């Protein structure tokens, strides 16, 4: 395991995937490599293919390659492009959505407002535009979608207006000034009563928009299911409702269940392609919460392909 990296819900993931000798597994969010390493160590001749679009993950992947040789393959790829890969027939597929601890802790990446840095927020700095540029050029509709929908921020109107007014001033260029601008847009009474930093939700929304995180999830889940062998298991870890919602709806659809209360599709027209392994999301146990507070909002869903 990479020093300082604690893979979330590891016990539970291994319990559902149940790695077997010579099994083949796909880790779509390599990150620190903790889940991948645990799979490789779980049984003889296990093989793992891992994806990550962050170039910072490559040295960690190279270290695993030195240890496990051809049993481990790393692909420099966004999981939103999973359908492009020729690989298939996996015994298990894992997603661990959201920003990684490494990305949060690397100040210069601009994911956190706790340290001043260029407001970048890209999971792959080689593609797309940094958050600072996105904020300067995004349409009103794009800003509203990011702050209101992706950030779930009730004061979205004030924040969108503040961002528009700050264009061309340099205030959107760095995390500290951006966080200050967002906080100032929120009424003082709500700022002081909040349990989280007032810029938290807006930063989340901008990050999701810059990286097309929800779009990638919606593309990746059906692609991952298609790559499962019969009897293969799909595990999905999410950290907030925006990530969990498409996973929940996809799982229910694959299991022949209504996707929501508004889903009026007759039961005889539904096709059951999988069995649910989790009736409700699995959350971290008390010992994991004590050892890794960042795991507190994690939820795990699992299904088995028929």
From Swiss-Prot:
One GO biological process term: rRNA base methylation
Biased segments, Basic residues type: 296-306
Keywords: Cytoplasm, Methyltransferase, rRNA processing, S-adenosyl-L-methionine, Transferase
Listed GO CC annotations: cytoplasm
EC number: 2.1.1.199
Region (Disordered): 280-306
UniProt GO molecular function: rRNA (cytosine-N4-)-methyltransferase activity
Gene3D superfamilies found in the cross-reference section: Putative methyltransferase TM0872, insert domain (1.10.150.170), Vaccinia Virus protein VP39 (3.40.50.150)
Reactions that this protein is recorded to catalyse: cytidine(1402) in 16S rRNA + S-adenosyl-L-methionine = N(4)-methylcytidine(1402) in 16S rRNA + S-adenosyl-L-homocysteine + H(+)
Top enzyme class: transferase
Compartments reported by the entry: Cytoplasm
Pfam families registered for this protein in UniProt: Methyltransf_5
Binding site for S-adenosyl-L-methionine: 33-35, 52, 79, 96, 103
Statement: the UniProt record of this protein carries the keyword Oxidoreductase: no
Major place of residence: cytoplasm
Record family assignment: Belongs to the methyltransferase superfamily. RsmH family.
Record's function text: Specifically methylates the N4 position of cytidine in position 1402 (C1402) of 16S rRNA.
Protein name, UniProt field: Ribosomal RNA small subunit methyltransferase H
UniProt organism field: Opitutus terrae (strain DSM 11246 / JCM 15787 / PB90-1)
